[in-house]
From Swiss-Prot:
Gene name per UniProt: msrB
Enzyme Commission (EC) number: 1.8.4.12
A GO BP annotation: protein repair
Entries under Pfam families matching the protein: SelR
GO terms assigned for molecular function: peptide-methionine (R)-S-oxide reductase activity; zinc ion binding
HAMAP family, per the entry: MsrB
Signal peptide as annotated in the record: none
Cofactor(s), names only, from the UniProt record: Zn(2+)
Family: Belongs to the MsrB Met sulfoxide reductase family.
Source organism (scientific name): Xylella fastidiosa (strain 9a5c)
Keyword Metal-binding recorded: yes
Residue intervals of the MsrB domain: 15-137
Entry note: cofactor: Binds 1 zinc ion per subunit. The zinc ion is important for the structural integrity of the protein.
Protein name: Peptide methionine sulfoxide reductase MsrB
Amino acid sequence: MNVAFDLTPPSPSQREALIATLNAEEHRILLQHGTEAPFCNRLLDNNQLGTYTCRFCGLPLFHSNAKFKSGTGWPSFFEPYTHAHIRKQHDTSHGMIRTEILCARCNSHLGHLFPDGPPPTYERYCLNSVSLTFIPTGTLLPDQLHRGDNTAYRT
């Protein structure tokens, strides 16, 4: 279900409160554009039905029906929950030219987008598990910013 969510960034005080909830690895990946090691992340082999939300702000990012096994060692999806929830940015770090993907609401680093996915989009959204929280189908979506916009929707 694609519904409208408030994409206003967290206020400075909300952002500081959210930063305080991160462990060192989450901070490195979400806020410093890091990457977790392949094949040893918690959501790679998750096959449950549900929604993957931003670990930092709770915005729905991907649905399990768009997840596929890419063989790369990171959770991969062929399309986002809605394109409005993903921001794309040109990335030339580490001597490569790539498209970085970030949460459209809080600007947290999620991973990268590659043009080698399956039909129908032929895109591969390659994500860090650390950047995501999995919400099983039938569970209320998180409302980390206390705006009341997520709590009416179940995955």
